[in-house]
Amino acid sequence: MAEQKRNRREEILQALAAMLETSPGQRITTAKLAANLGVSEAALYRHFPSKARMFEGLIEFVEDTLLTRINMIMDEEKNTLSRCHAILQLLLTFAERNPGITRVMTGDALMGEHDRLRGRMEDLFNRIESSIKQILREKAMREQQRFIVDEAVLANLLLSYADGKISQFVRSNFKRLPTEHFSAQWQVMEQQLISA
């Protein structure tokens, strides 16, 4: 029974993500979501007490996926720039593979929803920025080199790049892929980081 309930919850979240992808700029109502799934709104509320909880389910997926992978990168990669590259690539690739959820990441799908949802996404991006800042600060210990520019400034620059590419993806209705030109752009950023 619990497995069936979890499967239904996942099905609801997948349908919500798909609707966010195919209906850019439109607000998703529980009535539209229920109709898309072929169930009643009451059936949705048996699995989620509110639409905000549905969005929280998507946010939890984003948090779990990204933070788990970032921790893996921290364990597997030892070089500062390789770690930064891997985290940026992770963010861009995740967004590209999950267009509907990307609208949640940018806050686009959360307009008019509960403020705590946007706060959770902001907190996630702050945590990612803190991870990047920590990586940059560890360079002094790992590689016996420090950056000339403050690590907080560099971490913000790197995250802003990814945030901008993800926002561009949403604004273009998912036509401008976040990974477009990433290799060439990373080479420029890497050279700047080496001299920073």
From Swiss-Prot:
| SUPFAM superfamilies in the cross-refs | Homeodomain-like
- Quote the cellular component terms of the Gene Ontology held in the record: bacterial nucleoid; cytoplasm
Q: Where in the cell is it found?
A: Cytoplasm, Nucleoid
Q: What is its main location?
A: cytoplasm
Pfam families documented for this protein: SlmA-like_C, TetR_N
Q: Name one GO biological process term.
A: negative regulation of division septum assembly
Where the record puts its DNA-binding region(s)?
29-48
Q: Which UniProt keywords apply?
A: Cell cycle, Cell division, Coiled coil, Cytoplasm, DNA-binding
Coiled coil region boundaries: 108-135
Superkingdom as given in the UniProt entry: Bacteria
Indicate the segments forming the HTH tetR-type domain, all copies: 6-66
Q: GO MF annotations for this entry? A: sequence-specific DNA binding
Q: How does it assemble?
A: Homodimer. Interacts with FtsZ.
The similarity comment for this entry is: Belongs to the nucleoid occlusion factor SlmA family.
Q: What does this protein do?
A: Required for nucleoid occlusion (NO) phenomenon, which prevents Z-ring formation and cell division over the nucleoid. Acts as a DNA-associated cell division inhibitor that binds simultaneously chromosomal DNA and FtsZ, and disrupts the assembly of FtsZ polymers. SlmA-DNA-binding sequences (SBS) are dispersed on non-Ter regions of the chromosome, preventing FtsZ polymerization at these regions.
Quote the HAMAP family the UniProt record gives: NO_factor_SlmA
- Protein's name according to its UniProt entry: Nucleoid occlusion factor SlmA
Question: Which organism does this sequence originate in?
Answer: Idiomarina loihiensis (strain ATCC BAA-735 / DSM 15497 / L2-TR)
